[in-house]
Amino acid sequence: MAGYLPPKGYAPSPPPPYPVPSGYPEPVALHPGPGQAPVPTQVPAPAPGFALFPSPGPVAPGPPAPFVPLPGVPPGLEFLVQIDQILIHQKAERVETFLGWETCNMYELRSGTGQQLGQAAEESNCCARLCCGARRPFRIRLADPGDREVLRLLRPLHCGCSCCPCGLQEMEVQAPPGTTIGHVLQTWHPFLPKFSILDADRQPVLRVVGPCWTCGCGTDTNFEVKTKDESRSVGRISKQWGGLLREALTDADDFGLQFPVDLDVKVKAVLLGATFLIDYMFFEKRGGAGPSAITS
């Protein structure tokens, strides 16, 4: 103000000991415009005694954990550890149904709760299927849902009948393929179908005893799984009745296999092989020779 004079005794304040900025600082370009170089983000230095941790972000996936096999369980048979029932469904083949031409059998396996366990496929030549019928030699490959072969069943050619103790049927069980874990051996009996469940050293572990008449009409046909001295039953192999038309026109059968949940996995696998052998011996029609249940 023109002509303003400070009052008497007024003295100006001394300057501060720190620099006084003049004007406003230039703003930091966090989002540079066109033609401007991006400004790197400045991370403040950590306070004394504190470490600086990186900000959370996507973590790169590491290598997969190595698979640890269960002790005493062949690789691929882990699905047998926690189950006590297997349902086996044989697929119906149209060529076999309408033309009577014997084809390789195909099966689906599920647990008692409906969980898919895998598929089994027969491998045999056409001449053996036509000439030997249900007695034909074959190889069955059982693959898990990932199409990995985990079990192999081998049946050699044995010509014989139940009325004499020669040419008894047999099946070898391998898991993994190439490693024998047991055998299924038919035991001679004049009236009853009997089988011995053997371990890799061909020592008996269990017995399977069937009924005198296996051609059940309207009911299931049960084969009891018993201890090796046949004193008590520990499981069952059941051929389930599929209906009059299906039983008369097709060879497609349904089986149920029951065993204790704490049974050795290898013995469970051999019992599975026994189920397939029973299907071929008693419920598979012979090529041009009538039902195998009469002559096996």
UniProtKB/Swiss-Prot annotation:
Region (Proline-rich domain (PRD)): 1-58
Reactions catalysed: a cardiolipin(in) = a cardiolipin(out); a 1,2-diacyl-sn-glycero-3-phosphoethanolamine(in) = a 1,2-diacyl-sn-glycero-3-phosphoethanolamine(out); a 1,2-diacyl-sn-glycero-3-phosphocholine(in) = a 1,2-diacyl-sn-glycero-3-phosphocholine(out); a 1,2-diacyl-sn-glycero-3-phospho-L-serine(in) = a 1,2-diacyl-sn-glycero-3-phospho-L-serine(out)
A GO term, aspect molecular function: calcium-dependent protein binding
Sequence ranges of Low complexity compositional bias: 1-11, 25-34
TM stretches of this protein: 267-283
GO biological process: apoptotic process; cellular response to lipopolysaccharide; cholesterol homeostasis; glucose homeostasis; mitochondrial membrane organization; regulation of apoptotic process; regulation of release of cytochrome c from mitochondria
Biased composition (Pro residues): 12-24, 35-45
Cellular compartment(s): Mitochondrion membrane; Mitochondrion inner membrane; Nucleus
Motif (SH3-binding 2): 21-27
Positions where lipid (S-palmitoyl cysteine) attaches: 159, 161, 163-164, 166
Primary localization: mitochondrion
Topology with respect to the bilayer: Single-pass type II membrane protein
Impact noted for substituting residue 164 to A: Complete loss of palmitoylation, mislocalization from mitochondrial membrane and reduced apoptotic function
UniProt modification remark: Palmitoylation regulates its localization to the cell membrane or the nucleus; trafficking to the cell membrane is dependent upon palmitoylation whereas in the absence of palmitoylation, localizes to the nucleus.
Topological domain ranges for the Mitochondrial intermembrane compartment: 1-266
Function summary: Catalyzes calcium-induced ATP-independent rapid bidirectional and non-specific movement of the phospholipids (lipid scrambling or lipid flip-flop) between the inner and outer membrane of the mitochondria. Plays an important role in mitochondrial respiratory function, morphology, and apoptotic response. Mediates the translocation of cardiolipin from the mitochondrial inner membrane to outer membrane enhancing t-Bid induced cytochrome c release and apoptosis.
Family the entry assigns: Belongs to the phospholipid scramblase family.
Subunit structure: Monomer. Forms homooligomers upon binding to Ca(2+), Pb(2+) and Hg(2+) ions. Interacts with PDCD6 in a calcium-dependent manner. Interacts with PRKCD; interaction is enhanced by UV irradiation.
Domain notes: The Proline-rich domain is required for phospholipid scramblase activity.
Protein name as it appears in the record: Phospholipid scramblase 3
Species annotation: Mus musculus (Mouse)
